[in-house]
From Swiss-Prot:
GO terms for cellular component: plasma membrane. Belongs to the LpxK family. Its EC number is 2.7.1.130. This is Tetraacyldisaccharide 4'-kinase. InterPro entries: LpxK, P-loop_NTPase. It comes from Oleidesulfovibrio alaskensis (strain ATCC BAA-1058 / DSM 17464 / G20) (Desulfovibrio alaskensis). Transfers the gamma-phosphate of ATP to the 4'-position of a tetraacyldisaccharide 1-phosphate intermediate (termed DS-1-P) to form tetraacyldisaccharide 1,4'-bis-phosphate (lipid IVA). Keywords: ATP-binding, Kinase, Lipid A biosynthesis, Lipid biosynthesis, Lipid metabolism, Nucleotide-binding, Transferase. GO terms for biological process: lipid A biosynthetic process; lipopolysaccharide core region biosynthetic process. ATP binds at residues 51-58. One of its GO terms (molecular function) is tetraacyldisaccharide 4'-kinase activity. SUPFAM superfamilies: P-loop containing nucleoside triphosphate hydrolases. HAMAP family: LpxK (MF_00409). Pfam families: LpxK.
Length: 356
């Protein structure tokens, strides 16, 4: 999500407040860098962003968890669990948990990556210590961890939106969407930007101008549709009839991208796209209103985990896979020019594991 229209119109007035917030965030970080952060006994990887909005953090976390499962490693995700109301803290999310207890994204991760453990706790230094004692992790993943200072980390994967390289560059809250100033990007081990493979080359001048001085790779990724999976109102293995009209609904950070992805996968647009706020909790009234069209419904996996009310009509979700497709590096190390994300991460992991 980019700056709001009011922020843009009031930017000259809000800019001094943004500068003050930027200084405050720097001072806060220095305090923890001087020894107040909680260390961990195993490698810790943060996946976060510089600003607010849907930059694709959860798909990148999911990629790391799937990589860990393939390599026989136990990954533990430390997440605050936005809008979660767990019965106790720390709270271990299971595939059987409710979205109300776990939060939508933690529950989605727990269901899609059962070999990993997802722990919800807004105090992540507490959940890190608790998990080290009880869960035998091979490494931690800090979800939305770039500005989180309580837990020390070995690697920061920083996600950027295309707007971050243009109009949003350096606009710190409340003057823009950024949580810190551009100097914070020097902490990044790599940048990841969600874009189509055809868009990536057009962004290279921005990488050179904005990110080249940091000397780390920039990886492009997209969400590749997998299959339509019935959620309710249709038996397992059922298929949406080819060409059948449908209604799309989503409560995510980038609804426009959802519409593009679903329409491209099915080959035609929905009759209607109901857009809800990010992390929206679906009510019976919501489902009744959408079922009133008498058409099948399609949603994202993040929406699907929150469907507890009777649907009234068949509902499908479109499974998505994280696809790293491009890389740019101003100064690639010897032998690493054009190295893809999987290869880069494998080398990074070997170094991290060797230091412990």
């Amino acid at each position: 999500m980019s700056s709001l229209p009011l922020q843009k119109s009031l930017y000259p007035l809000l800019r001094p407040l943004g500068a003050a917030y930027r200084v405050l965030m720097r001072a806060r970080r220095r305090r923890y860098e001087n020894g107040a952060a909680c260390g961990t006994d195993v490698p810790c990887v943060s996946v976060g962003n510089i600003g607010w909005g849907g930059s694709g953090k959860t798909p990148v976390v999911q990629w790391l968890l799937q990589w860990a499962a393939v390599h026989g490693l136990h990954a533990v995700v430390l997440t605050r669990g936005y809008k979660a109301s767990p019965p106790g803290l720390p709270y271990v999310v299971t595939p059987q948990s409710s979205a109300a207890h776990a939060g939508d994204e933690p529950l989605m991760l727990a269901r899609s990556c059962p070999q990993a453990t997802v722990v919800v706790d807004p105090v992540r230094s507490r959940s890190a210590r608790w998990a080290q004692e009880r869960l035998a992790p091979d490494f931690f993943v800090l979800d939305d961890g770039f500005q989180h200072v309580q837990v020390a980390r070995d690697t920061d994967l920083v996600l950027l939106k295309k707007d971050d390289l243009h109009a949003e560059w350096g606009r710190v809250l409340p003057a823009g969407s950024w949580r810190e100033g551009p100097e914070a990007l020097s902490r990044a081990a790599a940048f990841c930007i969600k874009c189509g493979s055809g868009e990536f080359s057009g962004l290279v001048p921005d990488f050179e101008n904005r990110l080249g001085s940091f000397g780390v790779p920039v990886f492009g990724f997209s969400l590749r549709p997998g299959a339509l999976i019935p959620v309710c109102g249709a038996h397992e293995g059922a298929q949406l009839p080819a060409g059948a009209p449908y209604v799309l609904f989503s409560g995510v950070g980038d609804p426009a991208q959802v519409a593009v992805t679903v329409s491209s996968f099915l080959g035609y647009d929905p009759v209607r796209h109901h857009v809800f706020a990010d992390h929206h909790g679906y009510t019976q009234a919501d489902m009744d209103r959408m079922a009133g069209y008498g058409l099948p419904l399609v949603c994202t996996p993040k929406d699907a985990v929150k469907l507890t009310a009777p649907c009234g009509v068949p509902v499908w979700t479109l499974s998505l896979e994280t696809n790293f497709h491009s890389v740019w590096n101003a100064q690639p190390p010897a032998g690493q020019a054009g190295e893809g994300f999987a290869q880069w991460w494998q080398c990074r992991w070997q170094r991290l594991a060797g230091l412990r």
